Amino acid sequence: MQEAPAALPTEPGPSPVPAFLGKLWALVGDPGTDHLIRWSPSGTSFLVSDQSRFAKEVLPQYFKHSNMASFVRQLNMYGFRKVVSIEQGGLLRPERDHVEFQHPSFVRGREQLLERVRRKVPALRGDDSRWRPEDLSRLLGEVQALRGVQESTEARLQELRQQNEILWREVVTLRQSHSQQHRVIGKLIQCLFGPLQTGPSSTGAKRKLSLMLDEGSACSASAKFNACPVSGALLQDPYFIQSPLPETTLGLSPHRARGPIISDIPEDSPSPEGHRLSPSGGCRRVKGLALLKEEPASPGGDGEAGLALAPNECDFCVTAPPPLPVAVVQAILEGKGSYSPEGPRSVQQPEPRGPREVPDRGTLGLDRGNRSPESLLPPMLLRPAPETLEPVAPVDVLGPSLHGREWTLMDLDMELSLMQPLAPETDEAELTVKELNSSGVGKDHTLGTPLMLDVQADLEGAALSVPGALTLYNVTESNASYLDPGASPSSP
C-alpha cells in the first residue's frame, strides 16, 4: 500500500504512453482495489466486480469524474473490447455482473507494450483527406452528364407519348372512314345488283336477245309493238318476224339502211294464260315459207322498195327484212349462196359453218311458154289481199307472255325450192314478201321467178293465212338453224 503512491508521481512524467493508459495500469495493479478491479487469471484482461461501487469509490481517486459510462467510452476509444463469457450469455443484470475488458497490447507484466496502444482516429477525417480536387471535379462531371441523359430521356418519352396519342386518333379516324366507305360500297352494290336479284326474271333466268329489224320509222319501239299484237303461243319458236307499219318503207341505199334492233325477252316470265307454253305440246311442227314477188315501184321516190305483208288474221306480226339487192336475189335463185343481212348480232356469235350445198330440186318450168308464177297457183289461193293489218286483240308484246326463243332473219336458210301447191291448212304459216322494182336506169328489174325463203318455226294456235301467196314446200327436220348447230330448231 505504501509503494503504490510512490509510483504515481512517475506516471505523469514524460512518456509516449497516454495518461489514461498509465492511470489504468496503476489502477489495475493496485492490490488495495482488487475487490473492485483486478487482473484476470490469464493476465490478458482485467475484471470489474461491482460497477456502482467502482464508480463511486475508485474512479474519483484517479479521474476527475465518477461516471462508469465515461470510463467505458474511453476504453473503447483506445481499442479495449468487452469480453462476454458463454456462461453469462448477456442475460444477467449489469450491476451485479463482472465486466471484463481486454486488449492485445494490455498484458500483465509487460508494461512496454503500452506504447502500441493508440487512440482511435475518426475514419471520416482520414477519408476526407484522401479526396483530391481532380477526383471531385470528375465526379461532378459524371453526375451532370447523367442528369443530362436523364432529361433527354424524359423529353424523348414525352414525345413518344404525344406521337402515340396522334397515331391513336388517326386510327380512330381511319376506322370511321373505312366503315363509311363500306356502307357506301354496300349501298352501291345493292343499287346495282338489287333489281337483278329482286326482279321477276332474277332466279336463274337466261335472257336471250331477240333480233328485230328497225325499219327507219319515226315511231317508237312500243308503238311498233302495240301496232300489231302478237299471240304468245306463236312466239314459242325462237324465230319470229314482226310486220312493219303500213306507212313505213325501206331504202335501198347502203348509207340509209339501218341494222337490226336487239331486244331482250325473258325466257322464264309467266304466260298470261297462267301456264307455260311448251313447244313440245300437242301442236305439230310446221314450216313457214316466204315468197318474194315483183311489184311496180312506188311513186315516193326512185331506189326505194316497200315490203308489205297481207295476212288474213294478225295472230302474230311479221317484220320484213331489209331489201334484197337484185344481184343477191339472182345469186340465190342460181343456188350460189344465201342472204344474211348485215347488222349487229348478239353477244355470243355462233361458230362459222362451211357453205351448205343447195340440193337441186329441179327447174320451175317457167322458161317455156312465157308462163308466170301466178299461173302455177291454184284458183283458191288467188284472192285479193286486205289493204291493212287489223289486230284481232291487243296483246302486250313486251309483257311476260313472250316466251320461248328468238328468230332472226339472218339465221334463215334461203334456198331455191320446188313449187308444190298444197291446200291451205290451219296449222301452216304463209308469208308473202313483195319487193318493189326500182324505176331507175341501169337497174335490173327482171325477177321472173319468185324467191323462196325457208322459215322454220313452231307455231301454236291459229295459223297465218296469206292470200295471194303459194305454200311452197315443207322443210325437212334436218334443216337446223345457224344459232344452234347441234340442236333441233324446236329445242328451247
Swiss-Prot record:
The ranges of region (Disordered) come to 263-282, 337-378
- Stretches the record annotates as Hydrophobic repeat HR-A/B: 129-203
Q: What SUPFAM superfamilies does this protein's entry cite?
A: Winged helix' DNA-binding domain (SSF46785)
- Indicate where the modification Phosphoserine is found in the sequence: 298
Which InterPro entries does this one have? Answer: HSF_DNA-bd, WH-like_DNA-bd_sf, WH_DNA-bd_sf
Please give the Gene Ontology molecular function terms for this protein: DNA-binding transcription factor activity, RNA polymerase II-specific; identical protein binding; RNA polymerase II cis-regulatory region sequence-specific DNA binding
Alphabetical keyword list: Activator, DNA-binding, Isopeptide bond, Nucleus, Phosphoprotein, Repressor, Stress response, Transcription, Transcription regulation, Ubl conjugation
May I have one GO cellular component term? chromatin
User: Where does it localize?
Assistant: Nucleus
Hydrophobic repeat HR-C: where is this region?
364-389
Give the free-text PTM comment from the record.
Answer: Phosphorylated mainly on serine residues. Phosphorylation on Ser-298 promotes sumoylation on Lys-293.
Q: Look up the DNA-binding region in the UniProt entry and give its residue ranges.
A: 17-122
- What is an annotated GO biological process for this record, any one? negative regulation of transcription by RNA polymerase II
**Location of the Glycyl lysine isopeptide (Lys-Gly) (interchain with G-Cter in SUMO) covalent cross-link?**
293
Query: What subunit structure does UniProt give?
Result: Homotrimer. Exhibits constitutive DNA binding and forms trimers even in the absence of stress. Interacts with ALKBH4, DUSP26, MAPK1, MAPK2, MAPK8 and MAP kinase p38.
Q: What is this protein called?
A: Heat shock factor protein 4
Its source organism is Mus musculus (Mouse)
